[in-house]
């Protein structure tokens, strides 16, 4: 909306919002729900864990789905994709660095309408 490229007529098919967030729980790379450590103690200093996440502002920016998709031939919607990053976590009573799932982008998913 207020991004400079919008002045050039360029628009994203899916609007996203990015922010630094904290987490209390997450899904690890094995699919387990783990507790994310709020504070990390390294060299007698306490650090807070932050994660940079990108999420969809709206799963349907247009009534027909993603912006700019021909809705007469395609069904579409916006959804988040993710990646794995390391975080200090607890599973049971064991603390360790694990890869956890973080939302990193908002993308458009399309499927061809049947009968066209």
UniProtKB/Swiss-Prot annotation:
Specify the superkingdom: Eukaryota
Q: Which UniProt keywords apply?
A: Disulfide bond, Growth factor, Lipid-binding, Metalloenzyme inhibitor, Metalloprotease inhibitor, Protease inhibitor, Secreted, Toxin
| Major site of localization recorded for this protein | secreted
Q: Where in the cell is it found?
A: Secreted
A molecular-function term among this protein's GO annotations: nerve growth factor receptor binding
Q: Which cysteines bridge via disulfide bonds?
A: 14-78, 56-106, 66-108
Q: Where is the signal peptide?
A: none
PTM description? Not glycosylated.
Q: Which GO terms describe its cellular component?
A: axon; dendrite; extracellular space; synaptic vesicle
Q: Which GO terms describe its biological process?
A: cell surface receptor protein tyrosine kinase signaling pathway; modulation of chemical synaptic transmission; negative regulation of neuron apoptotic process; nerve development; nerve growth factor signaling pathway; neuron projection morphogenesis
Protein function: Nerve growth factor is important for the development and maintenance of the sympathetic and sensory nervous systems. It stimulates division and differentiation of sympathetic and embryonic sensory neurons as well as basal forebrain cholinergic neurons in the brain. Its relevance in the snake venom is not clear. However, it has been shown to inhibit metalloproteinase-dependent proteolysis of platelet glycoprotein Ib alpha, suggesting a metalloproteinase inhibition to prevent metalloprotease autodigestion and/or protection against prey proteases.
Q: How does it assemble?
A: Homodimer; non-covalently linked.
What's the protein called, per UniProt?
Venom nerve growth factor
Organism the protein comes from = Naja naja (Indian cobra)
């Amino acid at each position: 909306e207020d991004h400079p490229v919008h002045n050039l007529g360029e628009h994203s098919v899916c609007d996203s919002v990015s922010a630094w967030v904290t987490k209390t729980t997450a899904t690890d790379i094995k699919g387990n729900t783990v507790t994310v450590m709020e504070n990390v103690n390294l060299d007698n200093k306490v650090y807070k864990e932050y994660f940079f996440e990108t999420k969809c502002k709206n799963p349907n920016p247009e009534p027909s789905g993603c912006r700019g998709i021909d809705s007469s031939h395609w069904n579409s919607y916006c959804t988040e994709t993710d990646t794995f990053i390391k975080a200090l976590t607890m599973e049971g009573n064991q603390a360790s660095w694990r890869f956890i799932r973080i939302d990193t982008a908002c993308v458009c998913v399309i499927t061809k309408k049947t009968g066209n």
